[in-house]
Regions:
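Local cysteine-cluster metal-coordination motifs and their immediate loop/turn environment
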Residues: 35-62, 70-87, 362, 366-367
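Fe-S ferredoxin-like electron-transfer domains
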Residues: 66-128
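Single conserved hydrophobic/aromatic residue that forms the stacking wall/gate
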Residues: 1-12
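FNR/FR-type flavoprotein reductase catalytic core
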Residues: 206-393
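Generic structural signal for buried aliphatic residues
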Residues: 25, 138, 238-240
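Ferredoxin-reductase
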Residues: 106-234, 293-294, 320-324
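Short, contiguous acidic and Ser/Thr-rich linear segments
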Residues: 14-23
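Short, surface-exposed secondary-structure boundary micro-motifs
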Residues: 51-57, 94-96, 143, 203, ...
Length: 393
């Protein structure tokens, strides 16, 4: 018996699910069309698949306790992927879960937009629609497979601009195998006005390099989700679900907004910025976007932001490139050399009257996020003004 967290009295959303004994609560809920977030695919690592087990379910496991406060444990919160169905159960799930749907989608595009990043676009089935707030993420089912990068990745979809780097680093010598079906979460780069589709920016997760002076990759498998996505071609079918997450803009505030991104962390930030400008036509808030990349050929959606900058005087786009880039100079693209956290500080925040009054929205690689966090902390920005996304970087 499943009900929303706002109370068991809300009968209108109660649902009975019959399931065989022995499986996980996560699997049982999925079989009943209730899709809890599960970024790690049910491995007990992400702590996302939370539900309140009001009756049944037994004692909480040691593997779950680290994800909950003592009060939450007392209130019967569990990780659905760790909780086995051994008897009749009464379960409460977060209200928004009832808005999540799963579809078989068709791939409509899967091209590289940077050396190691794909723009992956799928169409929802005809007549289907997803209501979501920009900054949400989707989940993709990863089936069992065995693949060879050289045979199974379409080189024409990587493109001539990026192929030399793939060959130089030996990526086409990699192989990947997935022995059990899994799920992965990726932030959506699209915003609602772009129609009934899901657009992700996916970075290939290669094995670490061997320590110098050795060359090549360590004998470790590449990422099973990104490897799978990089093999997909237009016309292929994939199972997706969404929307999930709460990395959303605060719409009813008039505070200044700053987005900070790097790498594939572009996705949810693009969605939010496009929605705030193109859809909501926001002109009464100061807005800026600082994006960090190694070089100009690793920057994508640049035209989107330059166009918004022209159309909205309250929006500015700032590009930070790791080092001086002759290609950017030749193209006349404005940028500042340096890491993004330093560029934000030196070119903007150090002379800002009140950095603590800005809302910060951040998504990108771990080291970037940590450096930005430390810089903002040193400026006295309270933690609650920072909004993070975990599924884009």
């Amino acid at each position: 018996d499943v009900a929303p967290s706002r109370g068991l009295g809300d009968v209108y959303k109660r649902q009975d699910i019959e399931t065989p004994i022995g499986g996980t609560l996560l699997g049982a809920l999925q079989s009943g069309g209730i899709f809890l977030s599960s970024a790690c695919g049910g491995g007990g690592k992400c702590g996302q698949c939370r539900a309140q087990v009001i009756d049944g379910g037994g004692e909480i496991l040691p593997t779950e306790k680290g994800f909950f406060s003592r009060k939450q444990v007392k209130d019967h919160w569990r990780l659905a992927c760790q909780c086995k169905v051994k008897e009749d159960m009464v379960v409460q799930v977060p209200d928004e879960v009832f808005g999540v749907k799963e579809w078989e989608c068709e791939v409509i595009s899967n091209k590289n937009v940077a050396t190691f990043i794909k723009e992956f676009i799928v169409a929802l089935p005809k007549g289907e629609h997803m209501d979501f707030i920009p900054g949400s993420y989707a989940q993709i089912k990863i089936p069992t497979y065995s693949m060879d990068y050289n045979k199974d990745i379409d080189k024409s979809l990587i493109g001539p601009e990026y192929l030399p780097a793939w060959e130089k680093f030996g990526l086409f010598g990699l192989k990947c195998k997935n022995d059990s079906p899994s799920i992965r979460a990726y932030s959506m780069a699209n915003y609602p006005a772009e129609g009934d589709r899901i657009m992700l920016t996916v970075r290939i997760a290669t094995p670490p390099f061997k320590p110098k002076p050795q060359v090549g990759f360590m004998d470790v498998m590449p990422g099973i989700a990104s490897s799978y996505i990089f093999t997909l071609k237009p016309g292929d079918k994939v199972t997706m679900s969404g929307p999930y997450g709460d990395f959303h803009p605060i719409f009813d505030s008039k505070r200044e907004m700053m987005w900070i991104g790097g790498g594939a962390g572009m996705a949810p930030l693009r969605a939010q910025i496009m929605h705030m400008t193109k859809t909501l036509k926001t002109t009464d808030r100061k807005m800026s976007y600082f994006y960090g990349a190694r070089a100009l050929n690793e920057v994508f959606y640049l035209e989107d932001f330059l166009e918004i900058e022209k159309e909205f005087p309250n929006f500015t786009f700032h590009l930070a490139l790791d080092r001086p880039d002759p290609a950017a100079d030749a193209a006349g693209v404005k940028y500042t050399a340096g890491f993004v956290h330093q560029v934000i500080h030196d070119t903007y925040l150090k002379d800002h009257e009140a950095p603590e009054d800005i809302e910060y929205y951040m998504c990108g690689p771990g080291p970037m996020s940590k450096a930005v966090e430390n810089m903002l902390d040193n400026l006295g920005v309270p933690r609650e003004m920072l909004h993070f996304d975990d599924f884009g970087g």
